[in-house]
């Protein structure tokens, strides 16, 4: 391993984990609180017979739960990724790593291990890689395949985070040409491609463009969970970038709420992951009723991961129990049945959906 100071990218990854753990970076307002599943008093199913498994990008998961892309790119994150991956394997759910740009561009064995550890810890789990759309424009297909090979990935997520980049002191704000770059990767990559937001969600129009580009899944990552604008505001404050700090604070609440984004994306694509402020198995159930294939969570796993694999497993089993209970009291023996269950929209989410539908 080279004897050198941490790179700017490594420092940024370490900052992100620290800020998310220590600071108030929740935006709130997922809209899931406005979703009411209709109770079935005669569910006509045995609780123990409820099947939470789903098909997902050519594989089968034991439950429609995804550990969302969080970290990697700094030696300090290796243990976190190890715990997350091992827990995903033990519980039969999917997991993504954070952006692999550092692993591709830095000659550092410690950085590389922060990614490769996931496949070592989870030989049979569904794992997906992660690159930014801005990087796809710079990388040829062979380089993108290296990201897949790095963790023997089952899929690749391409993240869109241009609000974060606009606030980030060292951000890349050239958003031109991303869709053609995504299409090129979709056409040539050896594994399925998921396009995901990073806390600001997708509107239907963007989801339609992605569906037309042939992406295999859309991860909404809507407004309501971790606000990366807020995270970058803390980083900007730390380096005295006061203007970017103010912009970051101003846009903390920006985006399409998770519930709305899930509805709009599910109308355009048949494989949607609902994430962004998803915190419980009931939230997952609501998202599936809105049309999602699965629900994704990130921050709720961060503290358990610091304690080790078993703490993450316990959190996942809690989610599974909450989801199974929601399926039971809606009379949904399978996840496909849950997708068809009745729900009611209330409050601001109903207003948002009605206005967007006009």
Curated annotation (Swiss-Prot):
SMART domains: IMPDH. It is found in: Cytoplasm. Its main location: cytoplasm. Coiled coil: none annotated. FMN binds at residues 69-71, 99, 130, 196, 226, 277-279, 298-299. InterPro entries: Aldolase_TIM, FMN-dep_DH, IPdP_isomerase. CDD domains: IDI-2_FMN. This is Isopentenyl-diphosphate delta-isomerase. It comes from Natronomonas pharaonis (strain ATCC 35678 / DSM 2160 / CIP 103997 / JCM 8858 / NBRC 14720 / NCIMB 2260 / Gabara).
């Amino acid at each position: 391993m080279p004897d050198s100071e941490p790179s700017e990218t490594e420092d940024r990854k370490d900052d992100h984990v620290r800020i998310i753990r220590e600071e108030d970076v929740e935006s709130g307002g997922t809209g899931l609180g406005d979703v009411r599943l209709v109770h079935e008093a005669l569910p006509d199913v045995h609780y123990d017979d409820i099947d939470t498994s789903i098909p997902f990008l050519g594989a089968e998961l034991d439950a429609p739960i995804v550990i969302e892309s969080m970290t990697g790119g700094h030696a300090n994150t290796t243990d976190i990724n190890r715990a997350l991956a091992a827990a995903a394997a033990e519980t039969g759910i999917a997991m993504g790593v954070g952006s692999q740009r550092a692993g591709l561009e830095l000659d550092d064995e410690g950085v590389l291990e922060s990614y490769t550890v996931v496949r070592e810890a989870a030989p049979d789990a569904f794992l997906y890689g992660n690159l930014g759309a801005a990087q796809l424009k710079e990388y040829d297909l062979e380089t993108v395949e290296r990201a897949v090979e790095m963790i023997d990935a089952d899929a690749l997520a391409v993240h869109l985070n241009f609000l974060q980049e606009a606030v980030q002191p060292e951000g890349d704000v050239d958003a031109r040409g991303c869709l053609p770059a995504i299409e090129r990767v979709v056409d040539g990559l050896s594994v399925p491609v998921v396009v995901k937001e990073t806390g600001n969600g997708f509107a239907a129009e963007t989801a339609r463009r992605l569906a037309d580009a042939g992406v295999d899944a859309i991860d909404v990552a809507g407004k309501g969970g971790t606000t990366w604008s807020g995270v970058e505001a803390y980083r900007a404050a730390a380096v005295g970038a006061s203007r970017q700090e103010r912009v970051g604070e101003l846009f903390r609440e920006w985006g399409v709420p998770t519930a709305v984004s899930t509805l709009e994306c599910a109308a355009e694509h048949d494989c949607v992951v609902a994430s962004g402020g998803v915190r419980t198995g009931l939230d997952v159930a609501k998202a599936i009723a809105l049309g999602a294939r699965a629900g994704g969570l990130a921050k709720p796993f961060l503290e358990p991961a610091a304690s080790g694999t078993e703490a993450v497993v316990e959190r996942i089993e809690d989610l599974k129990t909450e989801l199974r209970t929601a399926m039971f009291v809606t009379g949904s023996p399978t996840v496909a049945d849950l997708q068809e269950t009745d729900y009611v929209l209330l409050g601001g989410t109903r207003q948002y959906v009605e206005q967007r539908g006009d």
